[in-house]
Amino acid sequence: MTDQTNKIYLSDVTLRDGMHAIRHQYSLDSAVAIARALDDAGVDSIEVAHGDGLSGSSFNYGFGAHTDLQWIEAVAGTVKRAQVATLLLPGIGTVHDLRAAYDAGARIVRIATHCTEADISKQHIAYARELGMDTVGFLMMSHMTSPDALAQQAKLMESYGAQCVYVVDSGGALGMRDVAARFDALKAVLDPATQTGMHAHHNLSLGVANSIVALEHGCDRIDASLTGMGAGAGNAPLEVFVAAVDRLGLHHGCDVKQLIDAAEDIVRPLQERPVRVDRETLALGYAGVYSSFLRHTEAAAAKYGLSAFDIMVELGRRRMVGGQEDMIVDVALDMLKAREAA
């Protein structure tokens, strides 16, 4: 486990992954209120962007209530201690977007790719380092490749300049042994100076447990969000994770009661669809489907009179990955044709 004398680095993602839960509709006032509460409670960083990262606001992913820069500027002007982070997916966001985010106040960037496509992150990681940003590699859908193969992708990101590399369980499909194996593999090949992080989703109710297992296997940074606000069944709930590690005697530097109050009083009332494990979100973890497919799949199921659970299982069977949201409708239409032909 991470040395108990070392503080766990807590990266909050309520204002980025949490965007998925409300279709990217945070008001600036809500963003400021959440950021202020997180800053007061003691988190290390607050990630801010459209749910699909810089420039994610689009027909394919959903249009945001505000621009990334408006959200980032609002949060950067609010926090006194926490650093502002953002997310960039090569192919959606560009280095020009990254520069604009930096100018707006972001000082940390997570460059996110599918777990087997680290090679497309080279330009963005290098540019982030030129800007002097804390530069993080973010390997999404980490359940879809082996621990050793994932470690080699992490090594690529490190070679480009990433100072930290994340195991990202985008589908909430990893078990505790899976997490342990991946961190052991990363630690075996990465330079000791390169940190590692865990981004969990709660689709199998393992978000907190997997994050603790990651710590036991050398993880340095943990992503979490208030009430678990995030795609699918959400992320590891920040207030729950901090309470759990507090009972384990680990140093986290946060005020547990303030986090609980922020979760219940500020964030939970914003949920238009409860962020929880239910039939549809469990299907994501069971089938290993990208968590942000949830709302898109539910919309397709309602439109075509199909089961969202069945669509998700088929998406998992076809091994769809982030960025293939347009295929959800294709899968639904294929299922509709098959039903009509039966």
Swiss-Prot record:
Residues given in the record as Mn(2+) binding sites: D17, H199, H201
Swiss-Prot/TrEMBL GO biological process terms: catabolic process; L-leucine biosynthetic process
Catalytic activity: (S)-4-hydroxy-2-oxopentanoate = acetaldehyde + pyruvate
Site (Transition state stabilizer): R16
Superkingdom classification of source: Bacteria
Family: Belongs to the 4-hydroxy-2-oxovalerate aldolase family.
Name of this chain's protein: 4-hydroxy-2-oxovalerate aldolase 4
Organism whose genome encodes this protein: Burkholderia lata (strain ATCC 17760 / DSM 23089 / LMG 22485 / NCIMB 9086 / R18194 / 383)
